[in-house]
Structure formats: C-alpha cells, structure tokens
Amino acid sequence: TSMAGISGAFLLLPFQMSVLNYTSPSVSGTNHVFNIFAIPSGVYRYIKEGRMAWPLTWVIIAGTLPGVFLGFHVRVLYLTDPKAFKFFVGCVLLYIGSRLLKELIRKGKIKPSAAKALEEKFKQQQSSRLTAGIPSHAVVKTKHISLKKIEYEFWGEIFSFNPIVMFVLSFVVGIIGGAYGIGGGAIIAPFCISMLHLPAYTIAGATLMGTFITSIAGALFYSIPLIVNNTSSMPDWPLGILFGIGGFAGMYIGARLQKFVPQRLIKIILGLIIIFLSIRYILQFFV
C-alpha cells in the first residue's frame, strides 16, 4: 500500500475489528500508533530518492491536523456503536475504492497530456531494460508556488494543483481520518491520483508524510483520559507498536519497489481489496 502513498492502516482496522474483535473507540488510536512506527521507513525512501513533493506535503498537513481533532470527538462521542462504526468504515472504504477504479473502467476518457506522457515514458523505460523503472535522475522539482496554483516538475513533465482546494479537502479528510484512525492519507491519495491527475510516484511520499504527522496528533488526542459509555479511548500502545514493526519493513520495501511498478497495477490491486472490504462492512449494518 505504501506504493500508492497509503500506510495500510485502513486495512489493519478491519483486521482488528473482525479477527481480534477489537471494536472500542481506542482501536482508532491504536491505528494511529501503527502509523507512527510504520511510516518513517517509507518516507525515508521517498526523500532519499527525491520523490517527496514538499509543497503538497505541507498543504496536506496544514489541512488534516485540525480535522483530526474534530474526528477524534466524532469517533468517541457519536460512533461508539461497533455496528455503526463498521458501516462508517465501509462507506469510507467504498469511496476510496471507487476513486481508484473509476478511471480504470471509464472508456474513451482522455488523460491529461502530462500524466499520459509519464506513463509512456515508464513503458519505454521498462522495455529498454529488464530491471528498468523510474530513473534516478527523475526527482520532484518545485517550479511555482502561489495561493492559486502550485507547480512542480517530475521526469520532464509539469504537474499542478490548487492549494486552497487541497487544503479544504485535507481538512474534511482529517475529520474522517481522525475518526477512522488512518490519518487521512488513504483518502487524499486516490483523490490526488484520480481527480487531480498527479502521478503516484510524486504524491506517495507527501501523503505518507501527512499521515505520519497527523497520526502523531491523533495518537495524542486518543491518549487523553476520556471515558464515554464506560469505554476508554486510550490506544493499545504495545499492540500498535507490534503492528508498526511489521509495517516498518513493509513500508520500506514498498517505497523502494514503487518505481518499478506501473501505476495501473497499483490502482487495480488496491481498488479490488478496498471494494471487497467496503461491501462487507456496509452489508453487515443491514443484517
């Protein structure tokens, strides 16, 4: 999942709820703990390889941080019922999966020239050598920053986004991610790829970094001594750290291998997994 800029916490949460029967509000805080210990290795790889879009990173962080605080209160005060929370989780996952698969199933849709050119370069690079992927000289370079538009260059192509739109989206996502325990990157990443047509090779590091910072805030919020309906919101730190150790290795490997994997394959794998989980959790609400 780190190949697409997602920490994997959105898949870890259903595992904890279904297999471990861990359904109290503190499960969201435990997910934040996982992010804190798992993400740094992936972020390190993206920074080292020059594929960290810093302007995008700071906009995401600025928007999601205040949203996470509100999301914490939503989870603890209004989503304490496991059945209702699973339905909420299913709706979030359905959105993520549909965004990833949308442009894969649409026919006749012309991609932006920059995104299309990038895919063509990747195909040519693959055909030239068996181990070819994104070349080492392909790094993110910021070209222009303003309140209306931020532009950056990657592999000879120019990509841009509106920072105000991204900030508002990040704030809303922060609320959802704060309640869900994912930090928000799992929702922002497919939006950046599908709606803004930014390549996964450049947004993955930014969304992971944003998730890391907001997860620190989320874990602190959930660690506040607060008991609602006889249920504590305190994260299970040992469990979160244990998950994080495994995630640390997975994040590093995923970030390292990303430049060798086509974007289409990344979207298909993630999309199918997420859609399956979302349908499962939505249906359980009506049974």
Language model region names:
Residues 189-190, 207-214, 218, 255:
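Feature representing long, continuous alpha-helical segments
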Residues 12-26, 187-202:
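Interfacial segments of multi-pass membrane proteins
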Residues 28-36, 61, 65, 204-215, ...:
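Transmembrane helix-bundle signature of multi-pass membrane transporters/permeases
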Residues 18, 24, 45-173, 194, ...:
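Juxtamembrane transmembrane-helix boundary motif
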Residues 2-10, 27, 184, 203-205:
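Hydrophobic alpha-helical segments that either span membranes
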Residues 1-5, 171-181, 214:
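Transmembrane alpha-helix interface/packing and boundary motifs in multi-pass membrane proteins
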